Design a protein with these regions (language model features):
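Alpha-helical solenoid repeat scaffolds, predominantly canonical TPR units
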Residues: 85, 119, 154, 187-189
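Residue-level signature for tetratricopeptide repeat
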Residues: 68, 72, 89, 105-106, ...
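N-terminal alpha-helical interaction modules that lie
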Residues: 1-97, 288
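Alpha-helical adaptor scaffolds
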Residues: 98-163, 169-178, 194-197
Length: 290
């Protein structure tokens, strides 16, 4: 009887204490800004111990939770929460490929490319054979942020880790082109064309078509840039525009006067100094839908 009474009293005390603790926690919670409520992911060091060796299981659990709840928070803090969450997930399971991919996808929605690249760099360092993470980060840099230097960095990593995939060389060549490195881009396209000149597969034909288009375009861009630079140098030196392009060669401003990829001379407007190509590449007409 006494034992039963003691047990009941103990339960009553525990209940009273828990109610009091709950009230204190609720009161404390009310003092936090709305965006900080109901969110706490422990540190990676803590979870590595608390997981009792089941790190992959806890990484999966936190990953599933993060997909459901991350968008409930204000933009001012949401991305820091998100980055912390995926930092913890990938600390628990560094090979969790989907965590890097989904984390970067969510971060890109708020255009937090700085955090996208931090998470991508972590994944690439911890997974030295993984090329998809580099490709993934490069696509955000190229297509969304339009940071072609950053895109080039990741596409080159992807191509180095998976040299047998010509599509990655295509991306490297395009990143060089959009960054303004026409000579490097031209070199890549020429290599691609040479590698696939006899490839009759659909992909091989596409790469040859793409290479032809870009070789034509880049050759023209390089020529026009070279001629325009010579025209500008002539104008600054002589105080007037040259009478014609041939005078640039005669007076030492150009070694030779290039022709366009079709072998035709470039056009020159004496009044404005503008230099243009008279045979733009009709790529659609030459290669149908390509």
């Amino acid at each position: 009887m006494l034992r039963t009474l003691a047990g009941v009293l103990l339960l009553a005390l525990l209940f009273t204490g828990s109610v009091s603790l709950h009230r204190d926690l609720v009161a404390l919670n009310q003092t936090y800004p709305t965006e900080f409520r109901s969110y706490y992911i422990p540190s990676s060091a803590y979870l590595k111990v608390a997981s009792l060796g089941q790190r992959n299981f806890w990484a999966d659990l936190v990953f599933i939770w993060s997909i459901q709840y991350f968008d409930r928070y204000r933009e001012s803090v949401r991305d820091n929460y998100l980055f912390h969450t995926y930092e913890v997930i990938t600390d628990l399971d560094p090979r969790f490929h989907e965590a890097y991919v989904f984390g970067n996808l969510f971060l890109s929605l708020d255009r937090r490319f700085d955090l996208v690249y931090m998470l991508a760099d972590k994944g690439l360092a911890l997974n030295p054979k993984n090329w998809l993470l580099a490709w993934d980060a490069g696509t955000y840099a190229f297509f969304q942020q339009k940071d072609y230097t950053q895109a080039l960095k990741y596409f080159r990593i992807a191509a180095e880790r998976n040299p047998s995939d010509p599509r990655l060389k295509d991306l490297v060549a395009n990143a060089y082109k959009y960054r303004g490195d026409y000579e490097d881009s031209l070199r890549y396209w020429r290599e691609l064309r040479a590698d696939h000149e006899k490839d009759e597969t659909e992909q091989g034909r596409f790469l040859v078509f793409a290479a032809d288009r870009n070789i034509f375009d880049l050759t023209t861009k390089i020529d026009l840039r070279t001629i325009k630079a010579a025209v500008d140098t002539y104008s600054r030196s002589r105080g007037s525009l040259p009478m014609n392009l041939e005078s640039l060669v005669r007076q030492g401003f150009l070694k030779t006067l290039p022709s366009d990829p079709e072998g035709k001379p470039y056009l020159y407007n004496r009044a404005t100094g503008e230099v243009t190509s008279q045979t733009p590449f009709k790529f659609r007409g030459k290669y149908a839908q390509w």
